[in-house]
Amino acid sequence: MRAFSALEFGAVFAVGGSLLAVAVPAFFRNLSASKLTEPIEGLDRMVTNAVAYAARHPQEISFPPSAPLTPAEVPRGVRALDPRDAWQHLTWLSLDFRFTQPHAFSFKFDSELDPATQVMRFTATAHGDLDGDGVLSTFEVRGERVPGQPARVLPGMFIDREVE
């Protein structure tokens, strides 16, 4: 077996480097996207159920009452399994929202009626600390129900420090 020439070695090195240049960024992009699945899908489930809830209730109680951050302590750099009663708040039950598997984000639901306009609004929030440094990421979706109209989710999602 003969040794590689400098030219052959350079060609192999260049091809290998090119493959890494393409594969590594794609890997990290997909890794980042997989970590964002939980808050995006969780909020989507929550707001979809909030809009369905509003369709069955009068204007002044279009959405269930506010629910605290659940779990109260945002998991720090790990996926945590919740205590059995963590999702027993009336709002989580009304929205059919809970986690039965370990997860990395905490969720909150706020609702309020504007007394001047009678517009009912909600904010669904997810907080996470994927790297465990104590700095939280925030994902937030808003919705409303204007008198005489069906409830709707407002366009867009607020995201702050998405991979924190």
Region spans (language model):
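N-terminal single-pass transmembrane signal-anchor helix
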Residues: 1-31
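Short, glycine/small-hydrophobic-rich surface segments
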Residues: 40-45, 50-97
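A short, amphipathic edge element
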Residues: 98-109
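Short, solvent-exposed beta-strand/turn "edge" segments of beta-rich domains on protein surfaces
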Residues: 111-117
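Acidic, glycine-anchored loop motifs typical of Ca2+
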Residues: 129-136
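Low-complexity, S/T/G/P-rich flexible repeat/linker segments used as non-globular hinges
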Residues: 136-164
